[in-house]
């Protein structure tokens, strides 16, 4: 029996309309009744996730910013990781050959240089939104991550530029087909889940995890039971071909699987 369940949000727990379904909420409550520790492991900001947990009265640990922050049930900061100031400066000041929009995160929020209302659709559930700033005046010493949002092919070309400029000084990953992230070296959900399990006196073998994108790769590959969403990025399936694939987030597939796991633990599971 798993003792901790870790969930990605977008494309995993959240439905395509960016809401948590009633079946999902009911299943999360059932897990807590079984004393299974809940952990939300997401690229979203800690401020947003703390607001969501408060609104839902859910007790859960938070891995946010794709591993840049870890918070306890009480909101205590357990782990932090920031981009080195020189890396942040290079990424912010360089003229990249891309049409993608740039987004900067620190403990105070989400910042960008231009209005982009379409991006806010993903935050209708929480109301979280960006703040418009002069990017060149951003304090460099407290940047947690920098994201580029745009067309996937354009971002793939940008990824090559970033690799050439940064070398091994940052970790690059796609958190979605339209979002490329620049993170601190060694920063990923799997690495910080290790930190959290050690804090809780657990091992990764005691954990199950669910995800859909390349920012979930290390987490899914390191836990005792990792599950890939049916709507996952093809690259994730290719990287972890041995892991089971469940249904689509639009059908609340995580809830569907966990309901079976709770009620019929000894029977084989089918996502149909």
From Swiss-Prot:
The active site is at residue 8. Pfam families: Hydrolase_3 (PF08282). The keyword Chaperone does not apply. CDD domains: HAD_Pase. SUPFAM superfamilies: HAD-like. Keywords: Hydrolase, Magnesium, Metal-binding. It is an enzyme of class 3 (hydrolase). Its EC number is 3.6.1.-. Mg(2+) binds at residues 8, 10, 212. One of its GO terms (molecular function) is magnesium ion binding. It catalyses: 4-amino-2-methyl-5-(diphosphooxymethyl)pyrimidine + H2O = 4-amino-2-methyl-5-(phosphooxymethyl)pyrimidine + phosphate + H(+). Its cofactor is Mg(2+). NCBIfam families: Cof-subfamily (TIGR00099), HAD-SF-IIB (TIGR01484), PRK15126.1 (NF011705). Belongs to the HAD-like hydrolase superfamily. Cof family. Catalyzes the hydrolysis of 4-amino-2-methyl-5-hydroxymethylpyrimidine pyrophosphate (HMP-PP) to 4-amino-2-methyl-5-hydroxymethylpyrimidine phosphate (HMP-P). HAMAP family: HMP_PP_phosphat. This is HMP-PP phosphatase. It comes from Escherichia coli O81 (strain ED1a). The lineage of its organism: Bacteria, Pseudomonadati, Pseudomonadota, Gammaproteobacteria, Enterobacterales.
């Amino acid at each position: 029996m798993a003792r901790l369940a870790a969930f990605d949000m977008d494309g995993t727990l959240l439905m395509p309309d960016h809401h948590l379904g009633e079946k999902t909420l009911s299943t999360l409550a059932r897990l807590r009744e079984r004393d299974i520790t809940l952990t939300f492991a997401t690229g979203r900001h800690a401020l947003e996730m703390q607001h969501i947990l408060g609104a839902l009265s859910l007790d859960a640990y938070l891995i946010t910013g794709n591993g840049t922050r870890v918070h306890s049930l009480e909101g205590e900061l357990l782990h932090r990781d920031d981009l080195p100031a020189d890396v942040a400066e290079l990424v912010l000041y360089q003229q990249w050959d891309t049409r993608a929009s740039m987004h900067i995160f620190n403990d105070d929020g989400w910042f960008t240089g231009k209005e982009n209302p379409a991006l806010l659709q993903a935050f209708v559930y929480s109301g979280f939104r960006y703040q418009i700033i002069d990017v060149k005046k951003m304090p460099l010493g407290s940047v947690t991550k920098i994201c580029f949002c745009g067309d996937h092919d354009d971002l793939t070309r940008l990824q090559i530029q970033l690799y050439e400029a940064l070398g091994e000084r940052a970790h690059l990953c796609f958190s979605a087909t339209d979002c490329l992230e620049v993170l601190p070296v060694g920063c990923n959900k799997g690495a910080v889940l290790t930190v959290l399990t050690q804090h809780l006196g657990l091992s990764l073998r005691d954990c199950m995890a669910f995800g859909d994108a390349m920012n979930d790769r290390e987490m899914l590959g390191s836990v005792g039971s990792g599950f890939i969403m049916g709507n996952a990025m093809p690259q994730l399936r290719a990287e972890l071909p041995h892991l089971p694939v469940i249904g689509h987030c639009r059908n609340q597939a995580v809830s569907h699987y966990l309901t079976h796991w709770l009620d019929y633990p000894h029977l084989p599971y089918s996502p149909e």
